[in-house]
Amino acid sequence: MGVFTYETEFTSVIPPEKLFKAFILDADNLIPKVAPTAVKGTEILEGDGGVGTIKKVTFGEGSQYAYVKHRVDGIDKDNLSYSYTLIEGDALSDVIENIAYDIKLVASPDGGSIVKTTSHYHTKGDVEIKEEQVKAGKEKAAGLFKLVEAYLLANPDAYN
């Protein structure tokens, strides 16, 4: 099995604590609300939402995928970090065993946020994942992120 790691950064005008509450802690409710064609809903299959929880995300009509299951690996509300692993679903394809994500929010000098994401693609066999193959996923994640940011800007009292 090979492991390929990719890093991404997004910036936001939203302070990190507020963005963490919305984009991480309440994502199961907020993302289907702001992007219903992308994500239909999220269901907890095992656990209480904390570490070890297994969630099933069902994608909307606008997605090329039907669903994914992921396991929550870590939540650190004090340090604004979250980690999870995609463990099942048609987004994994036949060459990817799983994808582990580490997300960290930090304050930017202008009072907004820098969202740092590290993705670890664990492949089956010696398959190599190319940057182009993950680009579409990164663009969709950036699109969801911008929808959440727009919601927070339009609703300044939300998630205070």
UniProtKB/Swiss-Prot annotation:
Keyword Cytoplasm set for record: no
InterPro entries: Bet_v_I/MLP, Bet_v_I_allergen, Plant_def-hormone_signal, START-like_dom_sf
Highest taxon, organism lineage: Eukaryota
Pfam families according to UniProt: Bet_v_1 (PF00407)
A GO molecular-function descriptor: abscisic acid binding
Keyword set, alphabetical order: Allergen, Pathogenesis-related protein, Plant defense
GO CC terms in record: cytoplasm; nucleus
GO biological process assignments: abscisic acid-activated signaling pathway; defense response
Family per record: Belongs to the BetVI family.
Name of the protein: Major allergen Pru ar 1
Gene source species: Prunus armeniaca (Apricot)
